[in-house]
């Protein structure tokens, strides 16, 4: 069964219930949340996340497999500022607790950035951080995301992710989130040779570690190292390639999460594209009028 959804918001008093309601309104059967704003580390207590009501709504609508994303501000690759590293380690420990309480199995993490110290130093620091965070007892896996290589980001290549995994003691608690935009922007040819890329991933990392897919088109050509998401079928990856990935038989059980941009000229009234993009991917037919339909949607 196709597991497809999007990033949704966990906010207000409804929290997890609000996230599930939003996902269902898009025709989704999975979703991804941040436990608070992605730009900061302010978080509500677990008791305020409205988990029980959220679970009831999810169960009623056939949603079992959800994903949590750690905030962007976390950087355990930073060797230059001990406070930034310590904040990342401490926050990740607490985020694992929240993720377990919510009932998600995967916590997606941007591995980190070396901020000028060099890739090797950054990778070693990420390993150090994960070794401080991960425990034998935890049930949540940290899903290291494939990165575009923008700035000093670590995790642009499968080899870098494998290096991190190999250096971590409890690496059975590590998985990978494959982002189509990032992988394309990093230089992998997922448009013309996705099966070749998948084989390379399997050889370097192991396909059994692939637990989350971020499905995004890209505003930039392959290898640009930019990381700018585009709506499905309207970027440099294109609908054919993304549809092939979404329906790939080897990836059937993996949650596919859309993180595509809201649509509209009015910055204060942009519309979420997810209901339309999910329907289009389910139908496996590209709609070149999609953006106009999203803007016209009054729901």
Swiss-Prot record:
Q: Which reaction does it catalyse?
A: Endonucleolytic cleavage to 5'-phosphooligonucleotide end-products
Function (record text): Endonuclease IV plays a role in DNA repair. It cleaves phosphodiester bonds at apurinic or apyrimidinic (AP) sites, generating a 3'-hydroxyl group and a 5'-terminal sugar phosphate.
SUPFAM superfamilies given for it? Xylose isomerase-like
Co-factor(s)? Zn(2+)
At which positions is Zn(2+) 3 bound? 182, 227, 229
Endpoints of the signal sequence: none
Q: What cystine pairs are annotated?
A: none
EC number, UniProt record? 3.1.21.2
Keyword ATP-binding assigned to the entry: answer is no
Q: Which UniProt keywords apply?
A: DNA damage, DNA repair, Endonuclease, Hydrolase, Metal-binding, Nuclease, Zinc
InterPro entries in the record: AP_endonuc_2, AP_endonuc_F2_Zn_BS, Xyl_isomerase-like_sf, Xyl_isomerase-like_TIM-brl
| Binding sites annotated in the UniProt record for Zn(2+) 1 | 69, 110, 145
Q: How is the cofactor bound?
A: Binds 3 Zn(2+) ions.
Keyword Metal-binding appears in the UniProt entry: yes
One Pfam family for this entry, by name? AP_endonuc_2
Q: Which gene encodes it?
A: nfo
Q: Which family does it belong to?
A: Belongs to the AP endonuclease 2 family.
Q: Which NCBIfam families match?
A: nfo, PRK01060.1-1
For this UniProt entry, the molecular function terms from Gene Ontology, in alphabetical order, are: deoxyribonuclease IV (phage-T4-induced) activity; DNA binding; DNA-(apurinic or apyrimidinic site) endonuclease activity; phosphoric diester hydrolase activity; zinc ion binding
Q: What is this protein called?
A: Probable endonuclease 4
Q: Give any single GO term for biological process.
A: base-excision repair
- Residues annotated for Zn(2+) 2 binding in this entry: 145, 179, 214, 259
């Amino acid at each position: 069964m196709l597991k497809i959804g999007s990033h949704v918001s966990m906010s207000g008093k409804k929290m997890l219930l609000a996230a599930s309601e939003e996902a269902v309104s898009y025709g989704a059967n999975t979703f991804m949340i941040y436990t608070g704003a992605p730009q900061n580390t302010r978080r509500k207590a677990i008791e305020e996340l409205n988990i029980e009501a959220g679970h009831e709504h999810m169960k009623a609508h056939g949603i079992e497999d959800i994903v949590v994303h750690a905030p962007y501000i976390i950087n355990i690759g930073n060797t230059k500022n001990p406070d930034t590293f310590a904040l990342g380690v401490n926050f990740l420990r607490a985020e694992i607790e929240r993720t377990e309480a919510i009932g998600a199995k995967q916590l997606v993490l941007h591995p980190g950035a070396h901020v000028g110290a060099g890739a090797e130093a950054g990778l070693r620091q990420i390993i150090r951080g994960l070794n401080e965070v991960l425990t034998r007892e935890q049930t949540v896996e940290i899903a290291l995301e494939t990165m575009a290589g923008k700035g000093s980001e670590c995790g642009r290549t499968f080899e870098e992710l494998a290096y991190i995994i190999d250096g971590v003691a409890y690496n059975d608690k590590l998985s990978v989130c494959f982002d189509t935009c990032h992988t394309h922007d990093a230089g992998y040819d997922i448009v013309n040779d996705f099966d070749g890329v998948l084989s390379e991933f399997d050889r370097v990392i192991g396909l059994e570690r692939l637990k989350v897919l971020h499905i995004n088109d890209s505003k930039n050509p392959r290898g640009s190292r930019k990381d700018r998401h585009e709506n499905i079928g309207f970027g440099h990856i294109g609908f054919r390639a993304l549809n092939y990935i979404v329906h790939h038989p080897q990836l059937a059980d993996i949650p596919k999460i859309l993180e595509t941009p809201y649509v509209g000229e009015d910055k204060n009234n942009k519309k979420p594209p997810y209901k339309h993009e999910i329907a289009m991917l389910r139908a496996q037919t590209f709609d070149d009028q999609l953006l106009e339909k999203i803007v016209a949607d009054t729901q």
